[in-house]
Amino acid sequence: MVLVGLQGSGKSTWTAAALAGTHAVVSKDHWPNARRREVRQRRVVADLLAEGRSVVVDNTNPAPEDRAALIALARGAGVPVRAVWFDTPPAVCARRNAARQGRARVPPAGLYGTLARLVPPSTDEGFARVDVVRAAPA
């Protein structure tokens, strides 16, 4: 499963509530100081899939080119891959992000940089399905 959405869109919160104990959660946020986090993430995902584990990739994954390698890994493992699109208004994401503490807070330029690249996922990319999670009214 590949999560797609801005920082502050609710990806990690949703994962904790909806997938507690059922999926291995892989996030580049787990290795904030690591070099080549993208390569490390792909290796961890591949290893987990090879073990037969259900995996959720909890990152922004804003554009098709960011998601392509993850889709290829799942297909290579013979696993259908699903996207979950967090359709949260940017203003809500910015407000949630501003309330975060420490490393969890992303600089506004980072959030808006992600927004500039954000393309909703599509089955045309190779996802078996795309589910949508909308933000609760604020």
Mark where each language-model region is.
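Generic beta-sheet signal
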Residues: 1, 53-57, 81
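Conserved GTP-binding G-domain of TRAFAC-class P-loop NTPases and closely related GTPase folds
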Residues: 1-4, 9, 91-138
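Conserved substrate/cofactor phosphate-moiety recognition/catalytic segment
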Residues: 9-55, 60-65
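Short glycine-/polar-rich loops that comprise or flank the Walker A/P-loop
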Residues: 23, 51-52, 77-82, 125-129
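Conserved nucleotide-binding/hydrolysis micro-motifs of P-loop NTPases
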Residues: 31, 62, 87-92, 137-138
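Short, hinge-like loop/turn segments at secondary-structure boundaries
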Residues: 42-46, 74, 99-103
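Aromatic/hydrophobic pocket-lining residues that form π-stacking "cages" and hydrophobic walls in ligand
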Residues: 70
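Conserved phosphate-donor/acceptor-positioning beta-strand/loop module used by diverse small-molecule
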Residues: 77-96
